[in-house]
Regions:
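Segments of small-molecule ligand-sensing domains
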Residues: 26-31, 279-364
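Extracytoplasmic "Venus flytrap"
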Residues: 30-54, 78, 150
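Secondary-structure end/capping motifs
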Residues: 38-43, 237-322
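Ligand-binding cleft/hinge of the Venus flytrap
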Residues: 49-68, 154-172, 205
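Short helix-initiation/N-cap motifs at beta->coil->alpha
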Residues: 70-85, 98, 166, 171-186
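A ligand-binding cleft/hinge motif common to bilobed small-molecule-binding domains
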Residues: 96-108, 158-159, 190-210, 304, ...
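Flexible hinge/capping segments at coil-to-helix
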Residues: 129-144, 235-239
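Pocket-lining segment of extracytoplasmic ligand-binding domains
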Residues: 174, 179-275
């Protein structure tokens, strides 16, 4: 009788536990994390990889659990498609990338969730040839603009043209990756190029001139990507997911401190781009350095992703609607902030949503 009572009590206790805790599987031996890869002077480096290993202590923490990290390279020329394919085929568990590609991936079926936002840190730029007389987006109406469709900065481009009463149909969009787009601008094949901070390299080489950027635009026009995790991995290994997210939040905290800004730029950011280019990207920005690295799931982030999901469908990039609660999973960041005593370090931001008309993204 006593044994039966103990059995029922134990069973009741197990059923009372959250599913993610009660049925977590034994940790895998390897965690596969995809990230943008750069080859600088024959040395392979991963975007944010070195920082999270050193300042976040990820490798050391996982080693104590008997888990190794396998970095999976994603070429800068096609980050979104490569990572989306990796998630879809089950070849990766985590990935650090931008906001539009994972929305496109989840439109087929819920596959990934954002478990650790990297903040509001990505600027987009409109560049014209150095000798071009164009000074505004309106000056490029009817002309060729190199833009890689389906990449995160497409949202910023759509915001820009829609704010001027224009649409994709007002331009001849050349859908090529950033490297090809930059080369096309340098050779005079296109009249404009829309991309990320490598726009400063075009200026540095005196082949391009930046005429617009998101630096002084509404903060929600910036890229808001982060660390995404496979739904299957989250379900099987919630504790390990928490360990990884905590390391990323710890890295964000370290990076966000003004005292560490120079070290971050010199030792980590410059693994991909020259220091001068990195500093130009960060200087004179409407978003403060600390806030650039906020991992909060605040109204600003939710509004941004609601807009991204809406734009993806309106523009014809996806057929199915993507629900916000299938994209965002704040529980791991919330736990990490408590564990690291950072609950009040970052402040939530409310950002007025940029209204995108369906016409802005049409005309592929």
């Amino acid at each position: 009788m006593l044994h039966r009572k103990i059995y029922h009590l134990a069973l009741a206790a197990m059923m009372a536990l959250p599913a993610s805790v009660g049925f977590a599987e034994e940790a895998p031996k390897v965690v596969r994390i995809a990230a943008v890869v750069y080859n600088i002077a024959g040395k392979t480096t991963y975007l944010n990889g070195a920082a999270v290993l050193t300042e976040g202590g990820l490798e050391e923490t996982l080693a104590k659990k008997g888990v190794k990290i396998e970095w999976v390279p994603a070429s800068h020329s096609a980050v979104g498609p490569i990572i989306n394919e990796g998630f879809a085929s089950g070849k990766i568990d985590f990935a650090s990338y931008g906001d539009l590609p994972p929305v496109i991936l989840n439109a087929s079926r819920p596959t990934v969730q954002l478990v650790a936002p990297w903040g509001r840190s990505g600027n987009s730029y409109l560049v014209v040839p150095a000798k071009s007389k164009a000074s505004t987006i309106e000056d490029l109406k009817g002309k060729k603009i190199a833009l890689h469709r389906g990449r995160p900065w497409e949202i910023a481009f759509a915001n820009l043209i829609e704010s001027k009463g224009l649409s994709f149909k007002d331009f001849k969009i050349v859908n090529v990756n950033p490297q090809v787009g930059a080369a096309a601008l340098a050779s005079g094949t296109v009249d404009g190029f829309f991309g990320l901070n490598d726009a400063h390299i075009l200026e540095q080489r005196k082949v391009g001139r930046i005429i617009w950027s998101t630096k002084n635009s509404p903060p929600d026009w910036k890229l808001m990507g982060g660390l995404w995790a496979s739904n299957d991995f989250i379900k099987k290994y919630p504790e390990l997911t928490q360990t990884i997210v905590t390391a990323y939040v710890k890295t964000n905290y370290w990076t966000s401190q003004d005292a560490n800004k120079d070290k971050y730029i010199k030792e980590y950011a410059t693994n991909a781009l020259p220091e001068e280019v990195v500093r130009k990207d960060y200087d004179n920005d409407i978003v403060a350095w600390k806030d650039r690295w906020s991992p909060l799931y605040d109204d600003a982030l939710k509004t941004h992703y609601r807009r991204v999901a809406s734009y993806a469908k309106q523009s014809g990039l996806v057929r199915n609607e993507v629900k916000l609660d299938q994209l965002l999973n704040p529980q791991f960041v919330e736990h990490a902030l408590k564990e690291l005593n950072l609950e009040h370090y970052w402040q939530s931001q409310q950002i007025k949503q940029a209204q995108l008309s369906p016409a802005a993204g049409k005309g592929k």
